[in-house]
Amino acid sequence: MAFRSQNFLTLGGRVSWAFYVLLLILVVAAGLRLNGVNWDQGFAFHPDERDIYMRSGCMYDLLADAPNALQCGYVLGEPDAEPGLPGVGTLLDKDRSPLNPHWFPLGSILIYILVFFRSIMELFTDMNALDMRYVGRPLSALADLGSVAMVFVLGRKFYGQGVGLLAAAFTALSVIHIQNSHFFRPETFSVFFTLVSFWAMWRMVERKRLRDSAILGLALGLAIAPKVSLLPILAPMFLVYWYRILDDVEGHWSEITSELVQRMFYHAVLAGAIAAGVFFITSPYVILDVGSFLGDIGAQTRMASNAGMWPFTIQYIDTPSFIYQIQQSSVWGLGIPLGVVVWVSIPLTAVLAVLKSDNRRADIFVLAWVVPGFIFLETFEVHFLRYVFPLMPVMIIMGSRMLLWAVRVDRLLSVHLIWGRIDSAMFISRIAIGMVIFVVVATAFYALAFQQVYAKDHPAVTASEWINDNVPKGIDIVSDNHWDEFVPNLYPYNVWQFPVYEPDTIEKMETLAGKLASSEYLVFYSSRPYASAARDPERFPFSIQYYKRLFDGSLGYELDRSFTNYPELFGVSFRDDAISRAGLEQPTPLNPADKSAINFNLGYADDNVVGYDHPTVLLFKNTGLLDESVLAVQ
């Protein structure tokens, strides 16, 4: 087997250079992830994260028997909930227990963690539910920092120390990792413990002890505790137990006995039982309130399987399977150079697994995670970018291996050019080394540019401040943010929300025409309404016409200004463009913002990429003052 047991000590007992390189990588990774913890200024623009904070706040109030705890959020719908610390009988009663979150799309452990930390912090200071972002987001960053370290461990174990260090550096600099670290959601925790479970799988193969299957079960349980997603990990788990069987018979298939298979089966059952136990301990009400658990999981499965079932998934109607996720992860999640490398590395790894035997087991293992996992995800119609996030660390290991393999491949080749034979070690190695340097520098540039998102105020906050400073109080404003986030602090204004996702009817559009005629401004929090309506013309024929007329100026509204916060560094910005994808005309703003010296328009960005921390907020002004009859549906 091509597994290595290098550590950070030299033969002389001194700490090796690799330790200092890894330490530097981790320091850089920590800085990129902890910068801008308060990126939303407390307005909680991520709906899932907000839900976790609010539910943990209500649970804390219920446990503390705080005033009005029974009127808090979800508790209002649970009339039997009993405040205070529960006894055993109350704890086991799903209706009375204050520890039942009554919400299972995500793991209960996330809520319990926040309640635990708040119970400690309340000893020293008063906090509200949204203040827990100062706890949740650093914890998410810490989990992803652990993923950087585990990528090094796995990369070194599979392909050597160089691959481990390069993969750790790429993971530290990957925007998809940096961005997810700024949200208190399950992904960073699940990814970290999934990588730990991969390490435990190899430990089990190498040491061949029952206790190693138990360690594997512990890691698996922690991997699924934040979010139930077990199926893709079964392929690599089956594979490593097959490796165990082959090792016990030294590769002689004919010597495999039923007793050996049965023994390995018991090892696997132990791992599965411990994983289930850990999951149930961290989320006990998935059993005690199994009906709600199955209902929530079923709803999430139906949502992912049917684009357009819920308003926030309409944007995925008719998005091409495989191509969409490859494009979005390459352009926005990793940056184009690294994105190309990691996706190209998949077929190359398959080829090397066939042609070369020295790393074959590692090659088959990483492919067993990435290929079935990606195919499984593409059975869904909804393609949130976060769905492929768990695949990224292993793909980065594969991509790093490919780059360093290219550096060494010159030993097997010679090059002939028209001016004569040259030494391959000088030609191919220099090209390959240059390619490695380019990908590292480009990935680092994009990572630093993305820090701009957290260095400045959120676009919705900037828009709110401008409106409050420049628009007279009490005027009418149309807000096109149905099933979307919001521009905060518009209480001094008469704000009417256009219900775009309600069925298109003449009455709906007549109401809109009346509001447009009487309002002075129209504001979008993000591109979601017009970008998603364009994906379903059969459901929203009138709304699509409204957006076309709005953006081409025929409704008498002109784009006053846009509020953006694109990734930018040294005068180079990376811009997304949802307007073109929606088939709308690009409006010319009355007050254009300053542009960077170099602007890369990278096209449409998935809502997961831009919708939470740097949406494009548009503010239209009613300059035409057209009559309601002119604004009506035509």
Name each region found by the language model.
Residues 20, 25, 124-130, 151-173, ...:
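Transmembrane-helix signature of polytopic, membrane-embedded enzymes
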Residues 35, 52-65, 71-88, 106-114, ...:
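Transmembrane-lumen/periplasm boundary regions of multi-pass, lipid-linked membrane glycan transferases
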Residues 130, 134-158, 196, 200, ...:
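Transmembrane-helix motifs of polytopic, lipid-linked glycan transferases
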Residues 1, 23-26, 238-242, 272-273, ...:
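Signature aromatic-anchored transmembrane alpha helix within multi-pass, membrane-resident enzymes
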Residues 30-34, 402, 429-457, 479-496:
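Transmembrane alpha-helical segments
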